[in-house]
Every structure is written in structure tokens, then in C-alpha cells.
């Protein structure tokens, strides 16, 4: 190998490592070490939950925000009950979705989660749901199922399902 070729290869490698290092610095865990949602995880789930539950949430902004905050607390409890390997996978998914590249690639969303309208996030979720790529479908399934489970674990939401509650025995 000539010295000039070796030098070019070295410079290209250094540039690639610098870019990869910069991307790695952008990735923040989706979950805290104790299993609660990190700030980036909360950002993703706030947008996702608002889009999934749009017609079930109050149109009043303050009540809606209170419902979403309560939902995020229930998501924290749900995620903390998951086994460690599932928490690790969810943390990776949320970390990826919190980056620009991950959000664009996996969710097909071109704008940051907080700036996207409910309709745009709904469209993004639908594209994940009906994607030909299994990884996008699985990501949608995880986000949807966690959101729905946490939402309907609250007794106040049961009437939306027509569920009167457990039958009293005795």
C-alpha cells in the first residue's frame, strides 16, 4: 500500500469514527436505571400516547395534560414490572426513537416528537403498523400495547370500554 493511499484511508477512518462518536453521544437511554422513563422516553411516549388515545382524552388542554401525566406514571409502573431483558429492549427502542435518525428511519417522522401534530404522529404510527418491515411493526406493537395497558389499568377509563368492573362475589 502506498503512503498516500494509507494516509487517505487513515483520514477517512478518522472521519467515520468522529461521525459515529457524535451519533453515539446523541443516544440517551430510554429508561432510567431504576426502570422509569427517561426524559427522552417520556417525550416519545407523550406524543405516542396522545396520538393513540386522542379520541379517549379530554379536549380540554389542562385535563388532557393531567391525563397524559398520570398515564406516564402508570407506564413507569408497568415498565418497572417487566423483566430486565424486556426493559433493556424497550430502553433501546425509546433511545433510538428519541434520535433524529431513529425517528426518521423507524417511525418515518420528520419532525421532533413535541413539534409533531397528533395527526402527523398518528400517520407515522399507522405507517409503522402496516410496514412491510417486521421491526417497524414490532416497535409499533410495543408502543401501542404499553400505552393501552397503562391507560386501561386506570379504573376511571373502564367505562370507555363498557366494562363495569369486576363482579362482586358474595
Q: Where would I find each of the regions flagged by the language model?
A:
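C-terminal segment of N-terminal export signals and the immediately downstream linker at the start
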Residues: 1-5, 17-59
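Short, hydrophobic/aromatic alpha-helical segments in well-folded domains
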Residues: 2, 6-9, 124, 146
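Sec-dependent signal peptide hydrophobic core
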Residues: 10-14
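Generic structural signal for short, solvent-exposed loop/turn connectors between secondary structure elements
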Residues: 28-37, 132, 139, 170
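Glycine-rich, flexible loop/turn motifs
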Residues: 33, 109, 157-159
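Flexible, low-complexity segments enriched for small/polar residues
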Residues: 38-153
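Short, functional C-terminal segments
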Residues: 153-170
